[in-house]
Amino acid sequence: MYHRNSAPPPPGWSGGYPPPQSQWPPHSYQYPPYPPQGPPPPPAHSYSPPPTYGNYPSPYSTPPPHSPSPYQHPQHGHSRSWTNPSLPPRPPRESQSFGKGAPSNYRFQYSECTGRRRALLIGINYIGQPNQLRGCINDVTNMSTFLHERFGYRREDMVILTDDQKNPMSVPTKINILRAMQWLVKDAQPNDSLFIHFSGHGGRTPDLDGDEEDGYDDVIYPVDYRVAGHIVDDEMHNIMVRPLQPGVRLTAIFDSCHSGTALDLPYVYSTQGILKEPNLAKEAAQDLFSALASYGKGDLSGVAMTAIGFLKKAAIGDSARQRTVMTKTSPADVVMFSGSKDTQTSADTFQDGEARGALSWAFIKSQKQRPNQSYLQLLNSIRAELEGKYTQKPQLSCSHPLDVNLLFVM
């Protein structure tokens, strides 16, 4: 997708490993000024900057009301889910130790997801622009209905940003997206359940703070990215993950290219439920092949440069992972399903008579067909829906070590 250069991302957070937060911290994020030469507003509207999130209208646009949700909050008289002991166990109420790789005595808290619910849904088709998409707005419509009917999210607690709306505050410009992200997490309390869904273009930009193993930050593109620039994963992490208290749940669905670590969550899990480590062995094999090719051509300097390059890459990759674990781990309960690995693109698909994003479609379908799955089961069922149709491989990542056999809740 796009790899447009824009203003450099914000400097990396150098505050070290964050302590668990007992109260809502002061937010240091400053709103960026809206570009003076932005895209023209929709007809019959004169754009004025949105108010601060304290007066944020919720929702920006409300879909037609549905019948009352059949969803009921689960009871917690036992550790198993609902009344069926064969279902995956619910998350434990006790605080959990981070274990290996984390500072001693540092703990996190799973969310029971029994408190307030809020959702931010962003769908951008980039109407009239190069590389226009077709299914992103449909994704938001379908996700809104699914959240309401399956998980009990109220329509009035959803903010929806799509680029087909006439209200300028409902258009997914960079400033609207950033302010909506702040609205999403404002005053969040333990056991609250927050949800963000982004369907649109994603890309990569050179990493400037050394926290990425591959040397690139993931970015998403607002509708006005040509003027306002992209939004970097470091920025999204600082706004939506860093302020959260222990026990607050944030579920993220990023259906975009190169979205594997779009929130900079340090714990990434395979379909076997194993915590992934950087694949330096594969890179070593690729670099060894290059070295042998140089040797065969008599290019000894090429052999030396390739060997030095691999050693440097391995050192940087290991250092980046340690930095991410030490600075991006959170005592909150943040879980993300992303449409593809950092190096992959995500696809539009055509399902049930309309264009959709592949991950958004698979996430909803797999849960409708089989409710009450574990995290690992859900990841594998999403992968199964896409297998053989697309090359992308959805990813599961978390802000803390995750017991992938627990019931997926949100």
From Swiss-Prot:
One of its GO terms (molecular function) is cysteine-type endopeptidase activity. One of its GO terms (cellular component) is cytoplasm. Keywords: Apoptosis, Hydrolase, Protease, Thiol protease, Zymogen. The active site is at 201, 257. Transmembrane segments: none annotated. One of its GO terms (biological process) is apoptotic process. Involved in cell death (apoptosis). Belongs to the peptidase C14B family. This is Metacaspase-1B. It comes from Aspergillus clavatus (strain ATCC 1007 / CBS 513.65 / DSM 816 / NCTC 3887 / NRRL 1 / QM 1276 / 107).
